[in-house]
């Protein structure tokens, strides 16, 4: 699948 994740 595809997706977007971010941690900052």
UniProtKB/Swiss-Prot annotation:
The modification Glycine amide is found at residue 8. GO terms for biological process: neuropeptide signaling pathway. This is Leucokinin-5. The keyword Secreted applies. Its main location: secreted. Transmembrane segments: none annotated. This cephalomyotropic peptide stimulates contractile activity of cockroach protodeum (hindgut). It comes from Rhyparobia maderae. GO terms for cellular component: extracellular region. It is found in: Secreted. Keywords: Amidation, Neuropeptide, Secreted. Coiled coil: none annotated.
């Amino acid at each position: 699948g595809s997706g977007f994740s971010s941690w900052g």
